[in-house]
Each structure stands twice: as C-alpha cells, then as structure tokens.
Amino acid sequence: MKMYKPGIESNLKNKLKKLFKKDRKRYEIVMKKMEEILQNPHHYKPLSHDMKHLCRVHIDSSFVLIFSINENDEIVLFIDIDHHDKIYGA
C-alpha cells in the first residue's frame, strides 16, 4: 500500500504547537492518528454537503481532525482540528 505525503495548513500548525505545550498526551495521539491516515486515508469518513471534499476522524469523543486527499499528488492535507461543535458549526 502506498504512503501518502503529509501537508499541514498553517492554522493547524499553530494549533498543534499550542497543543504540544498544553496537552502533550493529546498532541501525541493526534500525531499518531495523522500517521495512520497517511497509510490509508480512504478508511476514514468522507463528509457531505458544504464539506463534501473533506474527510474526518474523531481524535476523542469531542475533537475532530479534518483533512482532504489529493490523489494526483498523493498528498493528505490536514486542515483543522477542533471541538466537534466548532468544526460543524453547531
């Protein structure tokens, strides 16, 4: 199975830096999950409606990591991580 290359939006990079300082354990969980996604990005749930070009994975019960897949360049672009309600605007 091919391994996709990672891309990370600058907004997410900033959130990950803050998470690294505030909650090292959750940071490590996120990084491990990102590695898993790079190995098989199509395993995760595609979104619908306004977010139909994106996929998501729950990091824990409340937090969601959003990403997109670029098949041509074999890149997974990690876009955002936030509380479920903020991601979906609930």
Q: Predicted regions: what is each one?
A:
Residues M1-P6, K17-Y27, I59-V64, S68-A90:
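Enriched for short, Lys/Arg-rich terminal
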